[in-house]
């Protein structure tokens, strides 16, 4: 293509110029800028190619581990957990053990240990996991026990086999199960506000079911499985709309179990598509499908995922709500992209159709690649891994800042991709 440009340019110059001297001058005047332009074009293409080639989950994980390790040494108190970095700050603001986000930081540390094998990071993970034990043995005043305990003790048990961790997990599952209302068939969300809201079920709560499924397979009551399956079923039937977008909140009559209405709490409007809620659905229903082998849960994850992917903006990272009125100037939500990537990778491992399997893996890889770009990757800007997450826009809370759960799901997605790449490399070696 570059050669054709030169030939075309030279031919036109030869035709137009009568004077040989003037021709040479004119050629020089035109060729030099052209050569400069083409050179820049080559450099630009090479740079773009280099950026694509250089994205490696293993490389990014290595960089992230170094940053996480450095950050852990600055969080002095084991009962204070990073949550967000406000605008103008470079270090994490922390919350106590009872905040719903308390499990994400120890979860990040466990992922960093899994990626590196660094024993000093393991010690940090153990240190920040220990305080969450109290959640498992206290009355359930928070439905997010799965986020809090499974992401801390769950990873700890998976990576160490510590029997004490297992007992904490089993107790946490029993505690979460106390929020189940058999009249409705779902776990109560926001139990501390039950006088105001009666029985609500939010889409986020799908992510707490993994704790129940795990416990039922590891020495807990089979009732825990039944509760988790019922909750997923009620959520599927009532919170997933005909257009495949998801209500944030479903309100039910706590006595009759009747569905009253779907509404939002953190989205733009009741009928809008709140980005992170949609991704909780992708991932949550994929987990439910994996644990129950129910095709309707798998189909729900697929249609929710397809609706999400079909509505993504050009760079692939969703705005906080797909129907926010100020798009394209609305804040993005990198955390939703991270959750989506994990859900899509889970979904890719469940579908049998090879084309669909590749579609969801490619979509997840693209999301993580964009999150790893200079637009979203924090680098040296602050202690977080990712920029541009949005927590609760209607309350003007945590808007366009780093939030800890974005980093958690980013680390999970990177680890998943690394394992997929290693498996593919291993297969290629066998074939050769």
Question: Where are each of the predicted segments found?
Answer:
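Membrane-interface junctions at the ends of membrane-embedded or membrane-associated helices
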Residues: 31-35, 350-353
């Amino acid at each position: 293509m570059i050669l054709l440009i030169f030939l075309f340019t030279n031919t036109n110059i030869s035709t137009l110029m009568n004077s040989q001297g003037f021709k040479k001058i004119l050629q020089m005047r035109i060729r030099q800028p052209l050569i400069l332009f083409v050179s820049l074009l080559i450099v630009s293409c090479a740079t773009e190619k280099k950026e694509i080639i250089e994205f490696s989950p293993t490389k990014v994980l290595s960089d992230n581990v170094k940053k996480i390790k450095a950050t852990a040494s600055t969080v002095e108190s084991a009962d204070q957990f990073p949550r967000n970095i406000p605008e103008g700050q470079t270090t994490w603001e922390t919350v106590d053990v009872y905040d719903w986000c308390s499990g994400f930081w120890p979860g990040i540390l466990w992922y960093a240990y899994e990626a590196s094998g660094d024993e000093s990071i393991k010690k940090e993970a153990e240190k920040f996991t220990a305080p969450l034990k109290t959640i498992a043995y206290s009355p359930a005043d928070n439905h997010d026990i799965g986020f809090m305990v499974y992401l801390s003790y769950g990873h700890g048990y998976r990576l160490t086999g510590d029997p004490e961790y297992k007992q904490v997990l089993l107790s946490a599952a029993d505690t979460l199960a106390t929020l189940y209302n058999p009249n409705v068939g779902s776990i109560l969300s926001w139990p501390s506000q039950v006088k105001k809201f009666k029985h609500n079920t939010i889409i986020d709560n799908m992510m707490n079911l993994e704790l129940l499924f795990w416990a039922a397979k590891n020495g807990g009551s089979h009732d825990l499985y039944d509760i988790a399956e019922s909750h997923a079923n009620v959520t599927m039937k009532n919170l997933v709309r005909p257009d495949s977008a998801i209500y944030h909140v479903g309100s039910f009559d706590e006595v009759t179990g009747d569905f009253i209405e779907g509404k939002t709490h953190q989205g733009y409007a009741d009928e809008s598509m709140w980005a992170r809620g949609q991704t909780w659905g992708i991932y949550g229903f994929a987990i439910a499908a994996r644990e129950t082998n129910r095709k309707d849960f798998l189909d729900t994850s697929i249609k929710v995922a397809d609706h999400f992917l079909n509505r993504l903006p050009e760079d692939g990272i969703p705005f906080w709500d797909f129907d926010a009125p100020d798009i394209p100037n609305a804040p993005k939500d990198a955390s939703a992209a991270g959750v989506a990537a994990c859900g899509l990778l889970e979904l890719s491992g469940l579908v049998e159709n090879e084309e669909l399997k590749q579609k969801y893996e490619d979509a997840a890889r693209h999301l993580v690649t964009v999150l790893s770009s200079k637009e979203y990757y924090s680098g040296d800007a602050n202690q977080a891994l990712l920029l541009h997450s949005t927590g609760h826009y209607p309350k003007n809370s945590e808007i366009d800042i780093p939030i800890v759960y974005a980093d958690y799901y980013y680390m999970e997605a990177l680890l998943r991709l690394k394992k997929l790449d290693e498996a593919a490399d291993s297969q290629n070696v066998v074939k050769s």
